[in-house]
């Protein structure tokens, strides 16, 4: 009886998955939302029945995707199903929401790397080159318009953009990581919104103000900073490693800085509007980002929160 229930539930969830997949492939705009929701059937089934049952669902979903007849369908199925099963397994084990987010990001990243390699090896398509060519054409069109309007500095601006464009191939690892994180984050938001209504037990997301990155990141940041001062030759492996790690670590330090600002405002009972305004302003005022990043570094290295909390309790 229990086995029959599992099969029936699996069939129903596969039906929902195929519907979501078809909407993703053929319905504009709404397809973006259904694309992010593709993980949901796998999360629900695995959270209720375990990862072994989830693997069977991956296999069947893959076969059905092939039967649909589109390589894109299979390319969408593999990341969604594998990430969904991992998320469902961690939910079943009452995993922390940050752990679930990190695991989903890792699974999506592996899938994106695999897709990139397959595209180059089997189809001779380099997505970076395609993207660069599209951007280059857009820049040239903008230059032509600016020149026709009498903009004298158009060529200088285009030269700067062309130089920046050359770094996109070096930053491929960073782009893959950030894309994987964004995909995992929004998929998780949609998933948890739905599964709560299906009475699947999930742990709440810890407040952003409680985010505390490991202290070891400071050592990595220091090592990367020293390596960047050594100015490795452009195009070398060391150059790519330093460039990507610098970007990712600076981003993490900035996030830690924002977290501290939210924490400080919470402890001091300052309106949430203040930290939210700072986040918005940081996208508009570049020097503000440097200050927030420095706050993040100090927060990790010198345990600012403990000092503030101690002073607050002493009052």
Describe each model-derived feature in a short phrase.
Residues 148-205:
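Hydrophobic, aromatic-enriched interface-forming segments
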Residues 3, 14, 237-315:
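Long, positively charged, glycine-interspersed low-complexity recognition regions
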Residues 198-252, 256-257:
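Small-residue-rich helix-loop
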Residues 1-19, 146-154, 221-233:
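Membrane topogenic helices and adjacent juxtamembrane segments
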Residues 31-89, 296-299:
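Alpha-helical membrane segments and adjacent membrane-interface helices in multi-pass membrane proteins
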Residues 10-14, 78-123:
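Short helix-perturbing small/polar motifs within transmembrane alpha-helices
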Residues 118-169:
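Membrane-interface interhelical loops and short interface/amphipathic helices
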Residues 1-60, 269-278:
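Hydrophobic transmembrane alpha-helices
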